[in-house]
Amino acid sequence: RVDYLRVIIMELARIADHLICNSIVGVDSGAYSGFLYLMQFRELIYEIYEEVCGSRLTTNIGRIGGFERNFTNTAFEKLEKFIKEYPAVLKEFENLFNRNRIFMDRTIGCGPISAERALNYGFTGPNLRAAGVDYDVRVHTPYSSYEDFQFDIPVGTTGDCYDRFLVRNQEMWQSLSIIEQAFKKVQEFKGAEADVYHADVPEYYLPDK
């Protein structure tokens, strides 16, 4: 259960990152509307974080062995609202940009990075995958129960600004799917198991004398 909650927190962070990156690419390309479409959901993610741990940006709920506290019912309600409402807005955002001729003219061929150069420079994440490298640590070296989830790895071809934009968009869909799966798995825990948020270990150890 704790691993699934960790995955939810991490994938919300991925979406929060990608939506700000892609909406700002739109602003820099002369299209402000997309920024307004997505930022309201970045705010909703921060509201979830605030409900979970009291912090909007730095999720300080994590501890060795679990969390500092359990998720509240309000946090789950806000999460469910995000899962239900975000897909429609993300789809609208894609309709605004993905095949927009002006946006494509301003991003295709801009700042291309080859797969070889991306590896040599130590690129990771969507920038690496946009360059055509099919690698995601969540799949190739799974941690925190990622092996329990079904999702794809979006990969680009040219590593230009447009590819990076598309990969991030596709990753948001994959993250949304992971969050949905994790939310369903968390709901399967009943009774006392539904209250587990930390390993059964002492809060601290005293050193040997």
Provide a role label for each language-model segment.
Residues R1-K209:
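Metal/cofactor-centered catalytic core regions of large enzymes
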